[in-house]
Amino acid sequence: VPANCLLPMKVGFCRAHVPRFYYNSSSGKCEGFTYGGCGANANNFQTKAQCEKACR
């Protein structure tokens, strides 16, 4: 698993409600979360498919 996929899920500090996906290293799966719109890290994907492709 690439290092960016091991970063913790980060909602960010803005107040938008953007559906995104992150790789959950505990479950070994890509899971959905609501992103605030800014202050992301590299474990933040627009689709589940993008997450799964990047983090297998």
UniProtKB/Swiss-Prot annotation:
GO terms for cellular component: extracellular space; nematocyst. Its main location: secreted. This is PI-actitoxin-Afv2a. Does not inhibit potassium channels (Kv), as well as metalloproteases, and cysteine proteases (papain and bromelain). Disulfide bonds join 5-55, 14-38, 30-51. The record marks 15-16 as: Reactive bond for trypsin. Serine protease inhibitor that is strongly active against trypsin (950 IU/mg) and moderately active against plasmin. The keyword Ribosomal protein does not apply. It is found in: Secreted; Nematocyst.
